[in-house]
Amino acid sequence: MSAIVGLCLLSEKVVLSRSLTDEVSKLYKLNRGNVKEPRKYATERMSTQSKPVALQVPVSTIILDYKNEDFIKQNPTYSAMDIIGSPSNTAPQTAFQSIMPSLSALFNTPFIQGAFRHRIISSMGPEISYLVMVIGPPSGFMDTPNVSSAQSSVHTVSNADVDLNDIIAINSTMAKSTKLVSASTLQAMLVNDVYDRCMDLDGILLSQALPFFRNYVNVQSKGSLPPAVAACLNTPIKELFSMGSGKREPLALEFRKDNEGQCIGIVLPKGHEGDTLSSRYPAVFINESEPFSDKERSELSELKRTDSDAYEKLYSETISKHVSDGSYGNRVIISHKMSRLSNGGVKIIGRFKISDFNTVKKNLSSRSGEIDSAKEQWEALSGNGLVTDSNISMLHDKILDTITSNKPGVVLRDGNKKSENIVVCFKNGFPNKKHSLLQLTKNGISVVSLDELTDAGILVESTGPDRVRRSPKVLANKLSSFKGRKVTLDVDNMSTEALIQKLSTL
């Protein structure tokens, strides 16, 4: 099931969720399942004594409005902005238009209108978030929250006139600040409860919207809506969603023409599997020497043996020549050295390396003659702005993160991915704390919710007492009628690579 959710992000950790319509209530029920409400008080062991502490549930969104797949299919020409609403349009009137002024007054701070994508690919590695669209955080709302433990109070600092930990006071203030009758209904939610259950957001919208929501807060706080964001928000929904068979299309990484026309590149030393990036994403990456002719390669090879300085100079000049004649197209150039790109007129958007050179040595075990030059390139990369990771796959994800931040119009596709995805449903919820949904998607594995699962898919039940969860009645009926493949895996004790390999061989 596809979904568009209007939301207002107030902070990274602490916020309130509110219900405006029956549809939103259904969304809460779908996401939360039959889980118990958290206790108002708990105890924490302090040496030999048990100390009572208040239990405050950290949450991250205010849900303003929700439209399901039926609505989208009935209104395929609506844009995201049409559905969510804004002060600049009138069709249809939604919660966004009526509630934003009240929220602004309640928290005594201006709200920024626009689009926002929360944690699709994080700077610390891949992580798929659970909500889709829109509104924006208020400036100066939240200072650093301190969450000492799951059993302790969540301490927050805010410029609001009401204590954010006092749900009753907020209900009362909200009711006085808005004309909406249901505006007094607020509820705290666990982020992971929503995340585990909400696997039904459409992958196409997630992937196509990604580049438009990078650096949103910084850009929007300056008072201008980027054209790319406006274009995405006003694109008809039918162009963002796959409306036919309901199958999720493979994610793609492709470029539109760069308005500036300048070639961009990244620095990645030998032994960092740059060839893997260029072969996996041929529409995005190109190795620095790929356009070189046989004659140019021969001249460079001769100079490399006799005059290293002349070799590097000619190398940069050759890159510059192919930049000028358009041989690199609009792709990102992967180079082993910064000087080659900068001297060749290429804009460097990132420098990357594995944090431990021993990993590089292992990658070059079959090419031992290149280890010395690889070490020289590795040691030359340092200073502010250098991106590192101990794992090559995670480093490549950070490269993709940088690319999507710097190139408007980028959508994610793995060029080596199978044309038909493996469809998998995790009965007990996707183990997001252990595994990367992005990694599964990149390897041709589509994770769907139980109500999306067909008999052609695979149902995975996770072992371990902490993975057991009661299912709502409608989903229990779906489980009993499922006739496809079923498998039980200890997913919490498997690496992501092992999980991908196992699912791929089923």
Swiss-Prot record:
GO molecular function annotation: molecular adaptor activity; RNA binding
Pfam hit, one: Phytoreo_S7
Compartment(s) where it occurs, according to its Swiss-Prot or TrEMBL record: Virion; Host cytoplasm
Record organism: Rice dwarf virus (isolate O) (RDV)
Protein name from the UniProt record: Protein P7
Keyword list, A-Z: Capsid protein, Host cytoplasm, RNA-binding, Virion
Leader sequence segment: none
Family, per entry: Belongs to the phytoreovirus protein P7 family.
The keyword Metal-binding is assigned to this record: no
One term under GO cellular component: host cell cytoplasm
Highest classification ranks of the organism: Viruses, Riboviria, Orthornavirae, Duplornaviricota, Resentoviricetes
Spans traversing the lipid bilayer: none
Domain of life: Viruses
Matches recorded under InterPro entries: Phytoreo_S7
Keyword RNA-binding recorded: yes
Positions of the UniProt region annotated as RNA-binding: 128-249, 325-355
Function: Probable component of the transcriptional machinery present in the inner capsid. Displays dsRNA binding activity and may play an important role in the sorting of viral RNA and virion assembly. Together with the RNA-directed RNA polymerase P1 and capping enzyme P5, forms an transcriptional complex positioned near the channels situated at each of the five-fold vertices of the core.
